[in-house]
């Protein structure tokens, strides 16, 4: 194999390693709990990457981020596996 092919292979492997998440969970699971801008009091769940658990929080009803699940089952299915 020529050195050009080896260099190309090394580059592709490096790119693949950079694009592959360290864990299998989506990046949204790393976001902090965010209640949003409104003042509703909606029981919701988020994945806490520090405790590695889905935890309850109160969602305000608008805004926030994607780490916001209606049920603990949905949170587990998405972020715990």
From Swiss-Prot:
Keyword terms, alphabetized: Disulfide bond, Protease inhibitor, Secreted, Serine protease inhibitor, Signal, Toxin
Role played: Snake venom serine protease inhibitor.
Species, as recorded: Walterinnesia aegyptia (Desert black snake)
Chain ranges of the BPTI/Kunitz inhibitor domain: 29-79
Sample GO molecular function, one term: serine-type endopeptidase inhibitor activity
SMART domains: KU (SM00131)
Cystine crosslinks: 29-79, 38-62, 54-75
Other noteworthy facts: Negative results: does not inhibit vasopressin V2 receptor (V2R/AVPR2).
Any one cellular-component term (Gene Ontology): extracellular region
Keyword Glycoprotein set for record: no
Annotated signal sequence range: 1-24
Tissue specificity annotation: Expressed by the venom gland.
Compartments (UniProt record): Secreted
PANTHER family in UniProt: KUNITZ-TYPE PROTEASE INHIBITOR-RELATED (PTHR10083)
Family: Belongs to the venom Kunitz-type family.
Protein's name in the database: Protease inhibitor 3
């Amino acid at each position: 194999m020529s050195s050009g092919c080896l260099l190309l292979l090394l580059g592709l492997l490096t790119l693949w390693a950079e694009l592959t998440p360290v864990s299998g969970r989506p990046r949204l699971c790393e976001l902090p709990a965010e209640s949003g801008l409104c003042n509703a009091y909606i029981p919701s769940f988020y994945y806490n990457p520090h405790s590695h658990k889905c935890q309850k929080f109160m969602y305000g009803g608008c805004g926030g981020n994607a780490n916001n699940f209606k049920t603990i089952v949905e949170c587990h299915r998405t972020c715990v596996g």
